[in-house]
Amino acid sequence: MIPASGPLFNEVIHSPVRLRICALTRRISELEYAVIRDTLGLSDANLSKNLKVLSDAGLVSMRKESSPERTDARKLTWVGLTEKGRAALEGHLAALSQIAEGTGEAGDTSD
């Protein structure tokens, strides 16, 4: 895993929906799209839009897989944090903690 370089505020992760997605996938390798959608109470469009932002930033990976339980051609989408995503989330959480405790200013990784 790529180590976090300390508290770094991340604008991409900071969006409430994206923060919740990252937190949900933080301690597991991957989750199925519908599980994330249903757990967070999101619409397909909202989840898809936010996963695209995270994916474009290299913070999550997505893969499609056929399901033997489905009778149609649709595939399941699996979502997981990348190593970069895990490191960014850890740095962001540390930055939020530092901000909440008033112990210093966290750097911002967005340009």
Stretches with model-predicted labels:
Residues 56-72, 80:
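Beta-hairpin "wing" of winged helix-turn-helix
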Residues 8-46, 68-75:
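N-terminal helix-turn-helix DNA-binding core of bacterial DNA-binding proteins
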Residues 1-16, 57, 81-83:
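N-terminal leader segment of winged-helix/HTH proteins
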Residues 51-52:
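Short, hydrophobic-biased segments on the C-terminal half of alpha helices
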Residues 48, 77, 82:
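Ser/Thr-centric signal marking residues that sit
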Residues 42, 83-84:
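DHp/HisKA dimerization-phosphoacceptor four-helix bundle of two-component histidine kinases
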